[in-house]
Each structure stands twice: as C-alpha cells, then as structure tokens.
Amino acid sequence: MKTVGILIFDDVEELDFTGPLEVFGMAAHFGADCRTVTIAEQRKEIRCRHGLRVVPEFSLDDAPPLDLLIVPGGLGARTHARANAKILDFVRQQTGMVASVCTGALILANAGLLDGLTATTHHNSLDLLRQHRRSMRASERVSSSTIASRHRPA
C-alpha cells in the first residue's frame, strides 16, 4: 500500500490540502492501493487560514514512511512554516516523491529541494520565490515532459 502524507500547519490554505485529500481518498475508494494521512509538527489542533480546525493524524516525529509528501500553501507557508527548522528537516528527509501546492513551493525551496530546478508559485508570492538564494529559477510557467504548471491571475 502506498502512503500519501499531507503536511498541515497553522494558516494552511484549506483548499490546498483538502483538494489532494479528496482526490487520493476517492482514488482509494475506487480501488487504488493507497491511504492518505495528515501530518503536522505536533499532534495538536491546527487552525487553517479561514478558520477550519483540524487535528492531524501524525506528528513529524511519528509519521509513517511516505511514498508521496504533499506540501500545501497558504499564509502559513509564506510566513512561519517556510522558516521552521523542524518542518524543513522533515521535508528534506523524505525519500519518496515530494510535491507542493501553490506557496508550498516556498517550503520546498527553503528545504533545498528545488536547487537546480525551475519552479513556480502563486503570482503574489513569485517575488518571494525569486529571492531564494539557492541555485533555482522562479518562473511564471514551468513545463517538464507532459506536465505544465502556470500561475497567473484569471
């Protein structure tokens, strides 16, 4: 069974983690051999950006081995989470695939996972990503093989 972990933190954007949670939950419902878990720095209630309160299943210290870690964005990703040494260490230690949603890219950049790569994020945070000192390139549009990502206002 594959394990998908979704990192959550105070001021995480609800849609950024509930969207992937729903997608992988439905995949399991229709037969995919996977489970999805939520992970936070501690096993205590997280207050999301718009007031939703969530208690994670695991802390960073007791999280199971992951096949995929999803790092969502939100105000928390732009402020405290991207500078949290414990979160950055956890992200760095992942041996499976790692993906970000929106400003979760700032956490990946600070953890060094985007070194040598081109990455994008929410258009209002692109300058924050561009300020990153490591060898990465921030861009409005990124494409690789058959996947493309672009973030501009509608």
Language model feature labels by segment:
Residues T146-A154:
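Conserved anion/nucleotide-ligand pocket segment
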